[in-house]
Amino acid sequence: MSTAVRSGRVSSWESFCQWVTNTDNRIYVGWFGVLMIPCLLAATICYIIAFIAAPPVDIDGIREPVAGSFLYGNNIISGAVIPSSNAIGLHFYPIWEAATLDEWLYNGGPYQLVVFHFLIGISAYMGRQWELSYRLGMRPWICVAYAAPLSAAMVVFLIYPFGQGSFSDGMPLGISGTFNFMLVFQAEHNILMHPFHMLGVAGVFGGSLFSAMHGSLVTSSLVRETTESESQNYGYKFGQEEETYNIVAAHGYFGRLIFQYASFNNSRSLHFFLAAWPVVGIWFTSMGIATMAFNLNGFNFNQSILDAQGKVVPTWADVLNRANLGMEVMHERNAHNFPLDLATTESAPVALQAPAVG
């Protein structure tokens, strides 16, 4: 009887597979990382070059280029990678689709390159979170929580331009450009009066409040393991089995500060709540922007409230309406003649009948 002995030599591909999926590496790569790393590198390199040296972009498609780079007079606050031209619309616009490199730059090609590689990269990062959790035997909720900011990036860079019909409506990649996007979004969609945005505000601000409350309660109820002359941080050893703070004391304090049932007596349910509150809020905001992308806008109160004598009762809705009209008038000043919201009178026919002769 003969036995076959397999050679101990491992192929290069097997070595690569073992390295990619090895959880003992200082930084886990994973199969999603194989996609993530080149995409994020491409997006980052192109973004830096464009922010420094990209020529002006004809964002509105009316031959009035907008400069966004350092070399054309911007600083870190005003600079941005300008979205691709309205003349391109929703067309996929890689470098090889343009006749020349100058044309590609003039029409805002770098914006699409950065955004598409960035979205693929951050999506792969979420997959990598799941992959590492799976290999370590952990539960998958880390990538679920990360899906909230991922969805926010998806809606402002992809879904909103799709709904509006052009990547020129996407969010510029810069500080002032982001603020401009927010103001124009409010002017055109009244996002402040959208219930999903309100839930998102509650999620973000509430999450900040709960995080501060939790951190301060834990810090205030640490189990003392050190002397008065030492920092309390030295009382914790990484991996120790004992609780580092007294949850009973924290529970008792908070229950007396507000009322008993406002305080969690289960550490697991407490931390789930701390994670779920902001995540659900950001998901709602993303859904709100996705609906407004297709012009299902926030509540509008275009008609002022009148009293019995027909006089206007001033409300904050009136202030918001005037602010929206002002922002709409100011943005893209040369792209359209007059905002339709301000055209309150009926249009008169110009040449529907022939003039009388003789």
Curated annotation (Swiss-Prot):
It is found in: Cellular thylakoid membrane. Tyr-160 forms a radical intermediate that is referred to as redox-active TyrZ, YZ or Y-Z. The chain crosses the membrane at residues 28-45, 117-132, 141-155, 196-217, 273-287. It comes from the Bacteria. InterPro entries: D1/D2, Photo_II_D1/D2_sf, Photo_RC_L/M, Photo_RC_L/M_CS, PSII_D1. A quinone binds at H214, S263, F264. [CaMn4O5] cluster binds at D169, E188, H331, E332, D341, A343. The keyword Transmembrane helix applies. One of its GO terms (cellular component) is plasma membrane-derived thylakoid membrane. The record marks Y160 as: Tyrosine radical intermediate. The D1/D2 heterodimer binds P680, chlorophylls that are the primary electron donor of PSII, and subsequent electron acceptors. It shares a non-heme iron and each subunit binds pheophytin, quinone, additional chlorophylls, carotenoids and lipids. D1 provides most of the ligands for the Mn4-Ca-O5 cluster of the oxygen-evolving complex (OEC). There is also a Cl(-1) ion associated with D1 and D2, which is required for oxygen evolution. The PSII complex binds additional chlorophylls, carotenoids and specific lipids. It is an enzyme of class 1 (oxidoreductase). HAMAP family: PSII_PsbA_D1. Photosystem II (PSII) is a light-driven water:plastoquinone oxidoreductase that uses light energy to abstract electrons from H(2)O, generating O(2) and a proton gradient subsequently used for ATP formation. It consists of a core antenna complex that captures photons, and an electron transfer chain that converts photonic excitation into a charge separation. The D1/D2 (PsbA/PsbD) reaction center heterodimer binds P680, the primary electron donor of PSII as well as several subsequent electron acceptors. This is Photosystem II protein D1 2. It comes from Synechococcus sp. (strain RCC307). The gene is psbA2.
